[in-house]
UniProtKB/Swiss-Prot annotation:
Alphabetical list of InterPro entries matching this protein: IsoCit/isopropylmalate_DH_CS, Isocitrate_DH_NAD, IsoPropMal-DH-like_dom
Oligomer status and interactors: Heterooligomer of catalytic and regulatory subunits.
Keywords: Magnesium, Manganese, Metal-binding, Mitochondrion, NAD, Oxidoreductase, Transit peptide, Tricarboxylic acid cycle
Taxonomic path: Eukaryota, Viridiplantae, Streptophyta, Embryophyta, Tracheophyta
UniProt keyword Metal-binding, yes or no: yes
Top-level class of the enzyme under EC nomenclature: oxidoreductase
MF-aspect GO terms: isocitrate dehydrogenase (NAD+) activity; magnesium ion binding; NAD binding
Organs and tissues of expression: Ubiquitous. Predominantly expressed in leaves.
Official protein name in the record: Isocitrate dehydrogenase [NAD] catalytic subunit 6, mitochondrial
Chain sites annotated for binding substrate: 127, 137, 158, 245
Organism in which the protein naturally occurs: Arabidopsis thaliana
Length: 374
């Protein structure tokens, strides 16, 4: 595979069908949104959660890079509340949610849920209230940035609304607690359909359903049954079922064994971070949450890093690449490709890298270098 083709496959989307990126040289997984703009000169209204810790700094990097790339965007900045909103049972407010529902698209920096009882986590609230049913995380090697593996190119698709993360825990008796795992046919069919349609749309050859049905025969058994049913509709795509522990071993031994992985919530949380480690960490990994009614929320999945907050040391790559995914979703393919190439070239050159990438550049210098490549 040539370097041009190698990079093209990693560009996050390139088409304009119901799921973006229908050409063979793209990998854009996101459901299209019907919006009232058709050119790069029409302002886009998008929700922005700068987030906590380093969030505001890396959000500022995104703003600067988007401006340099002539992305005309009107950010609706949202900040979580200082008290629990009774309508959401979270520090995430009702107005925060309404912003995303209205704009249909958004970008989220890292959020830190305040410690304490009696309220839901911020991320869980977003997923539940906005029905963000699929988390799509491309995991690919960045040319010029050396890691333990070369040419990693896979996609994790995580069911995002149920499983062990249903919030159903209680104490049975003193010293004994119980947590309920919820798997439904509706949610499993929905994410399975998305995974196979994604694979077909983007020229992917294989879908792996990750499970532990050998032990959890009812819950994971239902998930697998749904994947089996959907797989039967796509005979051109190779389908396999892989036990979660074996999947972890296979990923570490040879990531090239996988293409598209679809899995329940908890497994997706774990496997997607494992895959990020194959290519350099969460600081290099973009992510997009897909919801019904055309909602898409891109996010940086790393932590808020309060220890370096305000020190101009943060790496904005993950949020920038997630922003690229958002632009692809909005069919702003030209600007998305320009920004993606500028990020890749900056990292590959090696002159300007933040400390986590082995360099000594500040957030400001790294961002400026990306803008200069534009």
């Amino acid at each position: 595979m040539t370097m041009t083709a190698f990079l093209a496959r990693r560009l996050i989307g390139n088409g304009s069908s119901q799921i973006l990126g229908t050409s063979s040289s793209s990998s854009g997984p996101f459901i299209s949104v019907s919006r009232a703009f058709f050119s790069s000169s029409t302002p886009i209204k998008a929700t922005l959660f700068p987030g906590d810790g380093i969030g505001p700094e890396i959000a500022e990097s995104v703003k600067q890079v988007f401006t340099a790339a002539d992305v005309v965007i009107d950010w609706d900045e949202q900040f979580v509340g200082t008290e629990v909103d009774p309508r959401t049972n979270s520090f995430l407010t009702w107005d925060n949610l309404q912003s995303v529902l209205k704009n249909k698209v958004g970008l989220k920096g890292p959020m830190a849920t305040p410690i304490g009882k009696g309220h839901r986590s911020l991320n869980l609230t977003l997923r539940k209230e906005l029905n963000l049913y699929a988390n799509v995380r491309p995991c690919y090697s960045l040319p010029g940035y050396k890691t333990r593996y070369d040419d990693v190119d896979l996609i994790t698709i995580r069911e995002n609304t149920e499983g062990e993360y249903s919030g159903l825990e209680h104490q049975v008796v003193k010293g004994v607690v119980e947590s309920l795992k919820i798997i439904t046919r509706k949610a499993s069919m929905r994410v399975a359909e998305y995974a196979f349609l994604y694979a077909k749309t983007h020229g992917r050859k294989k879908v792996s359903a990750i499970h532990k049905a050998n032990i959890m025969q009812k819950t994971d058994g239902l998930f697998l049954q749904c994947c089996d049913e959907v797989a039967a509709k796509y005979p051109e795509i190779y389908y396999e079922k892989v036990v979660i522990d074996n999947c972890c071993m296979m990923l570490v031994k040879n990531p090239a064994l996988f293409d598209v992985l679809v899995m329940p919530n908890l497994y997706g949380d774990i496997i997607s971070d494992l895959c990020a480690g194959l290519v350099g960490g969460l600081g290099l990994t973009p992510s997009m949450n897909i919801g019904e009614d055309g909602i898409a929320l891109a996010e940086a999945v790393h932590g808020s890093a309060p220890d370096i907050a305000g020190m101009n040391l943060a790496n904005p790559t993950a949020l920038l690449l997630s922003g690229v995914m958002m632009l692809r979703h909005l069919k702003l393919n030209k600007q998305a490709e320009q920004i993606h190439s500028a990020i890749i070239n900056t990292i590959a050159e090696g002159k300007y890298r933040t400390a986590d990438l082995g360099g000594s550049s500040t957030t400001t210098d790294f961002t400026k270098a990306i803008c200069d490549h534009l």
